[in-house]
Every structure is written in C-alpha cells, then in structure tokens.
C-alpha cells in the first residue's frame, strides 16, 4: 500500500492507503500484489471501453509520432477537424461546432463564460446570472464550483465564489411527491419561479445535468421535464446549458442522455467517457446561431487553454467514438443497462437500501436509516465511506457521495461499469456489493 507522507505523490486523500494499480483488462484493474478489482464505476464514470483497448493506445501513439502539439491560436489539425465533425453528427439538434478542452470543469467554465459573452455581444449586458440545480455538480474550477450545489466542496472557497441562485432538482426520491405529483421541482416549474424571482432580464443561463450524476445518484427526471425547461428558457431568453460530462458519450445507452427526452439545449458539454479515459479530453458544443454572434463581434471566444484542440487528445477521441460505433457499444450499453437495473432490484430488500435508480449503465443506490421516512444516517456514521471501504475489501470499486439529502447528511454509491461488462460481471458486481452491505450490517 502507498500513502502520504511516505510517497512524493500528493494523493487525493492524505489519510488513506492506496493500492498500486499496474494493469487493466476489460472491467478489471490489477494491483502490484496481483489482486484484481472489478471496476464497477469505470474509475470515475470514465472507462467506457474498458481497460487495455489496443486500438486507442495505437491511435494515440501514431498521432504523437506524426504531430504531437500545435496551439489552437495558430493551427488546426486533422484529428480536431475529424473529431468535431463526428461529435457534431452525434449531437442533438443544431449543436454543430465543438471547442475542445481537457476536463469537464474546463468545458463547463467555458460554457458559462460563453453564455455571458454571448449576451454582452448581443447588447444585453444585464443578463449575467447563472441558475443551477441543487443538489448538482459541475466541476471544481471556481465558476463551475459556484454553479455546483455541493456545499462541502465549497467550504474553503466561499469568499471566492459567485452567487448562483438555486433551483430544486427533480429528485423524485427526496421529493414529497415522489416524482408522481405536480410539484414545481419535478415538473420544472421551479425554474420559471427562480427566473421570475431573479428577474428574467438578469438571467443569462441555466445549467443542469440531464440525468443526475453522483450528486443525486443517477436520478432520472420525468419524461416531460426537459421539454418544460426548453419552453421556459425560450420564453425568458435564457440559455440552457446541458452538462453531459458524466451522462454523455453513451453512458445512458444513447450518445446524449437528452436523446431520451427529445429536447435540445443551447450549449452542451461532454467529457469523461469521450476518450474512454485513455487521455483527458472534454468538449463544448455550440450552435452556429451563437457562434455567429461572436464571429460578427469580438471574433473569438474569450477563453484560452494551452492544450485546447490538442491533436493527440483529439486522435484518442476520434478512435474512441469510432470504436463505440464499430462495436455497437451504445446498443450494448442500453442492453446491459437494462440487465443491470433488473439485477439491482434485489438490493431493495436490504434494510439499508432506500432506493435504486438510473438509466443505461449508470445506477445509484441510496442508503437510509429508515425506509419509511427516508431519513438519512447522520454524517458522523460515515456510512458511505464504510461501504466504499467494504466494497474495496470485496474487490469492487464503487463511487461515493454524501450530503445530498439535506446538504450535510445523505449516503449513496453509484455504479457505472464499462460498456463491455458481461452479464457474469454484472452478477459479480451485485454479489460483491451485497457482501459489502453485509459487512456494514454485521459491523453494526
């Protein structure tokens, strides 16, 4: 095991031991001792293709040997042009231009800045506010963090963050209507209420994840929700930014999660699975009607990043989207996702499990102290952390989240295995997760 301060690495956690990963194959990660871990969440919702796909590695190497780097202010490149065309072809509606960056946070930051620049260049400088869902998450750069409904992540930086008015998320399990009624949060009317409260003339954009990520444990809004959001944004001239960094690139069984809803946003971000995790890459989709305003005004998006439009990263993305298409992985994700959700139903009988939900190969398991009242455990119980540790002891990797119930309390874990997961591996995920849950009840 490796830990701080014995290593020169400043780890993501300075209080835990890390196994040293040395090899990956399919849905499995192997450490230096030879132990295999079933990667039930693709690292961080990233490893869509599975580990060890030679075609992606070879595409990266070939491009690095041919042309490793050019700056986006001076040149374009074949991989950037080809990948942008492929992504535009797959994107919903008129999102026909793509700006490449290297992380989801950067893509969100660029989208928010573009929204503001668009209104200024359109002569509507009063539009400067961004609205977002809570709970919700959009990244760790300061503007993206400001838009995130994750109080714990903001604790040390509150003085640096901008004020972002909050809209209650369509979080059916935590809503009094349980997703079946006409409450403003679940219908989308809460967005209109928030816009009117702030003043439509001041609201530039609304940002949200089409299917909930880790913040709400894969919550799926009702079928009419995003059409209602589109209607509201059109009525009040608000740009709708769809954050598909997590839910996009096929994770829900379609390339964009919004395909399930038939709604088209004004801007859309993607990341994580766009390269299957082989290199860092993210994308901001922009329609011509917005890009034209900049082209006829200042002439550029006022957002710079040294590695934007990087040819090697774009080559990896191009190889990934072609691999997904050639191997039918969207259809496979949908099919295996249906199986996963069928198999997860057994967890509902466990005394700690309050809800199981999701879409495609994205699933959330919410843990509660009392099923009838949906009361969460107190944060002091560290239930999520203990479950993650128990799962690792069983050789299963899952993703944790806390605080979603009321801003402080709440426990859930999410699953997002690679699209190449087999039915036998799905069974193994369920078996190991149940064993980890049993460790908690036995310990208690």
Predicted regions and their residues:
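Conserved N-terminal phosphate-binding loop of PLP-dependent enzymes in the Aspartate aminotransferase
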Residues: 1-444
């Amino acid at each position: 095991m490796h830990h701080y301060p014995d290593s020169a690495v400043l780890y993501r956690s300075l209080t835990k031991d890390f196994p040293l990963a040395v090899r990956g194959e399919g849905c499995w990660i192997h450490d230096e001792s030879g132990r295999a871990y079933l990667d039930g969440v693709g690292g961080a919702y990233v490893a869509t293709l599975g580990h060890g796909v030679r075609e992606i590695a070879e595409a990266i190497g070939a491009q690095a040997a041919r042309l490793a780097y050019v700056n986006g202010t001076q040149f374009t490149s074949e991989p950037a042009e080809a990948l942008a065309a492929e992504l535009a072809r797959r994107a919903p509606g008129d999102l026909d231009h793509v700006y490449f960056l290297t992380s989801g946070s950067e893509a969100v930051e660029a989208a928010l800045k573009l929204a503001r620049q668009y209104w200024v260049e359109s002569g509507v400088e009063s539009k400067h506010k961004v609205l977002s869902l809570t709970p919700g998450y959009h990244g760790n750069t300061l503007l993206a963090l400001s838009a995130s409904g994750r109080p714990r992540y903001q604790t040390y930086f509150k003085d640096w963050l901008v004020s972002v008015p909050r809209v209650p998320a369509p979080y059916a399990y935590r809503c009094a209507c349980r997703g079946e009624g006409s409450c403003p949060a679940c219908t989308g009317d809460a967005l209109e209420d928030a816009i009117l409260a702030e003043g439509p003339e001041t609201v530039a954009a609304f940002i949200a994840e089409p299917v909930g990520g880790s913040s709400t444990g894969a919550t799926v809004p009702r079928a009419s929700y995003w059409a209602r959001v589109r209607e509201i944004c059109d009525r009040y001239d608000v740009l709708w930014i769809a954050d598909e960094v997590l839910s996009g690139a096929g994770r829900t069984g379609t390339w964009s999660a919004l395909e399930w809803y038939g709604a088209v946003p004004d801007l859309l971000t993607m990341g994580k699975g766009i390269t299957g995790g082989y290199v860092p890459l993210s994308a901001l989709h922009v329609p011509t009607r917005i890009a034209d305003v900049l082209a006829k005004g200042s002439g550029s998006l006022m957002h710079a990043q040294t590695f934007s439009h990087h040819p090697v990263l774009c080559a990896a993305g191009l190889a990934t989207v072609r691999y997904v298409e050639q191997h039918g992985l969207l259809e496979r994700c949908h099919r295996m996702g249906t199986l996963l959700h069928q198999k997860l139903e057994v967890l509902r009988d466990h005394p700690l499990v309050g809800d199981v939900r999701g879409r495609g190969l994205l699933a959330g398991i919410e843990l509660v102290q009392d099923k009838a009242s949906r009361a969460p455990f107190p944060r002091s119980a560290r239930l999520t952390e203990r479950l993650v540790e128990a799962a690792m002891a069983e050789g299963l990797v899952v993703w944790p989240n806390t605080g979603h119930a009321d801003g402080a309390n709440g426990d859930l874990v999410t699953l997002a295995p690679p699209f190449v997961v087999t039915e036998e591996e799905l069974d193994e995920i369920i078996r190991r997760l149940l064993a980890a849950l049993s460790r908690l009840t036995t310990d208690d």
